[in-house]
């Protein structure tokens, strides 16, 4: 290891130990100093003081409301969201390998129904016993929860305006 010399007190930690250290001269390839210039007391910015908030001041709900009414766009968006779940949704059942095939694969269901209704309907069409298992997957990708809305699934995962539900009697995907 090199020992620090009087010309180069930093020793080997310097990026270029063999070049003499320049004092007072700024080279164009070196970054500027990170020290902030001294400011006058007139130009120095003071920190913004924190407001004193009393935790004991009761605030009513009406005082905390920012908007008195919803904007028109929000009303329209809410109306559109409610309208989606009022119609009918087309569901196409796709059998996975080793699953029984339905004679009619396309059915309509109310968009406001839960996915549980789809599974119960499929079990009835397949003449399943209470002990038989049916595994359903949307677009052969994921198994939705039984409490998921059919309208929301259709809106997010539809293919050619149909909700594709693949089914199997054994687990098909990990």
UniProtKB/Swiss-Prot annotation:
Its main location: membrane. It is a peripheral membrane protein. InterPro entries: Atg12 (IPR007242), Ubiquitin-like_domsf (IPR029071). Residues 1-56 are annotated as: Disordered. Residues 8-26 have a biased composition (Polar residues). There is a cross-link at residue 174 (Glycyl lysine isopeptide (Gly-Lys) (interchain with K-163 in atg5)). One of its GO terms (biological process) is autophagosome assembly. GO terms for cellular component: Atg12-Atg5-Atg16 complex; autophagosome membrane; phagophore assembly site membrane. The keyword Transport applies. The keyword Cell membrane does not apply. Disulfide bonds: none annotated. CDD domains: Ubl_ATG12 (cd01612). Keywords: Autophagy, Isopeptide bond, Membrane, Protein transport, Transport, Ubl conjugation pathway. It is found in: Preautophagosomal structure membrane. GO terms for molecular function: protein tag activity. Forms a conjugate with atg5. Ubiquitin-like protein involved in cytoplasm to vacuole transport (Cvt), autophagy vesicles formation, mitophagy, and nucleophagy. Conjugation with atg5 through a ubiquitin-like conjugating system involving also atg7 as an E1-like activating enzyme and atg10 as an E2-like conjugating enzyme, is essential for its function. The atg12-atg5 conjugate functions as an E3-like enzyme which is required for lipidation of atg8 and atg8 association to the vesicle membranes. Belongs to the ATG12 family. This is Ubiquitin-like protein ATG12. It comes from Aspergillus fumigatus (strain ATCC MYA-4609 / CBS 101355 / FGSC A1100 / Af293) (Neosartorya fumigata).
